[in-house]
Design a protein with these regions (language model features):
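Terminal, low-structured helical/coil segments at or just beyond the last alpha-helical repeat
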Residues: 2-12, 175-208
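Short coil turns that delineate tetratricopeptide repeat
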Residues: 37, 71, 104-105, 138, ...
Length: 208
């Protein structure tokens, strides 16, 4: 670590990105913080690395500090919300997703907040979030993104008992990305909707 003493902040960030291990990268970001205690990006990056290591408890204080240092960065609030979400702090997570959306609307923040609304059975709020996310320009070009949003909204529609709309969203999501990692959710959801609507499985999936 002695060689890092002569590096400036920019060089240290570049070195952290080239680090061979997450632990090594964290050590470099800590060096940045020593040089610049107000560097919110370094705090956020350490939080992300701990999150990637499956250690949300260690990530939490870094995300909190990042939002304190730069309260106008929506990504920091979204990252903080995700950690709180993983720890089961639903109210705090929703609050921070809301701050993130107010600053920098993104499909992930909307989808994650919608998931929590579904958990709380606030289905109309979940539907509104997914619909808003699907209308965002540019960010939803990836099929996986849209597929997950349709799945979350379908979950909300099923919660409301609106199986016709749920079936539409399930079929749409599965058509967008048939190899999605949540394919089991689509299959179970479609079967449930078919049973509730009294239609054949083939008809429900739009078979010819």
């Amino acid at each position: 670590m002695l060689r890092y003493r002569s590096m400036n902040i920019k060089e240290l960030f570049q070195e952290a990105q080239r680090a061979e291990t997450l632990t090594h990268a964290i050590g470099i970001y800590e060096k940045i913080i020593q040089q610049d205690p107000q560097n919110s990006e370094a705090y956020n990056n350490i939080g992300e690395l701990y999150g990637n290591m499956g250690q949300p408890g260690r990530a939490l204080p870094y995300f909190v500090k990042a939002t304190e240092l730069n309260p106008m960065n929506g990504v920091y609030y979204s990252n903080l919300a995700l950690v709180l979400h993983c720890q089961g702090h639903v109210e705090e997570a929703i609050s921070n997703y809301s701050k993130s959306i107010a600053l920098q609307p993104s499909w992930s923040a909307y989808n994650n907040r919608a998931t929590l609304y579904n958990y709380r059975k606030e289905y109309d709020n979940a539907i509104a979030d997914c619909t808003a996310a699907l209308k965002l320009n540019g960010q939803n070009d990836e099929v996986c993104t849209k597929a997950h949003l349709y799945a979350t909204r379908a979950d909300a529609y099923m919660g409301k008992g609106d199986y016709k709309k749920a079936l539409h969203d399930l079929n749409t999501g599965m058509a967008l990305n048939p190899s999605d990692d949540i394919i089991g959710f689509y299959d179970k959801g479609i079967l449930r909707c078919n049973l509730k609507l009294g239609i054949s499985p083939c008809e429900g999936k739009g078979c010819k």
